[in-house]
A protein has these predicted regions:
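Lectin-type carbohydrate-recognition ectodomains
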Residues: 1-173
């Protein structure tokens, strides 16, 4: 190891950066080109950008941008009712929103406040027929990957959510 104090600091930081990028690459390779993803519209409101749209399975927000997500809305697939696909967001440590039925916005509409995490759950027929998972990146470089539906997705530091991906797949029978 070098005696240079800058090298002693930069080397661990660079190793961490490489590890984070490798995790993101693994997340992308798992979700890329999966023909069994169930399509549905997702709209996210991004700091200083506005609304961005995509489908379930797409990444929303820009990884590495430093811009946080302020809220989102999922329009469910045709065979899933709004009451069967619910989501909630983390607005701060120990501060969770109420469960929001799909089709409705969840977040800090008009307040420019960052989300610090989220959770998606299925119930009823949707839970019997589909499985949900998600991944996210945060403005501090934290990565959360392949979280099963119903579990909280947040950085240990409660850093603002920067980008996320939600997938919905038919259950294997």
């Amino acid at each position: 190891m070098s005696d240079d104090p800058v090298t002693r600091i930069v080397s661990p930081v660079e190793r961490l950066r490489v590890e984070v990028l490798a995790r993101i690459d693994r997340l992308e390779s798992v979700s890329r080109g999966s023909p069994d993803l169930l399509p549905a519209r997702v709209v996210a409101h991004v700091q200083d950008v506005g609304d961005v749209e995509g489908n379930l399975g797409d990444w929303l927000g820009e990884r590495g941008s430093g811009r946080w997500i302020e809220g989102f809305r999922i329009t469910p697939p045709q065979d899933v009712t709004p009451a069967e696909l619910l989501y909630r967001v983390v607005v701060g440590p120990g501060q969770l929103s109420l469960w929001t039925p799909s089709g409705r916005f969840c977040g800090s509409e008009g307040l420019a406040q960052p989300l610090r995490g989220f959770c998606v759950r299925l119930q009823g027929a949707a839970a019997e027929n589909y499985e949900c998972s998600y991944a996210a990146t945060f403005v501090d470089g934290s990565v959360a990957g392949l979280i099963p539906g119903g579990q909280l997705c947040a950085a240990a530091t409660f850093a603002p959510l920067e980008a996320f991906q939600i997938t919905l797949r038919p259950r294997a029978r």
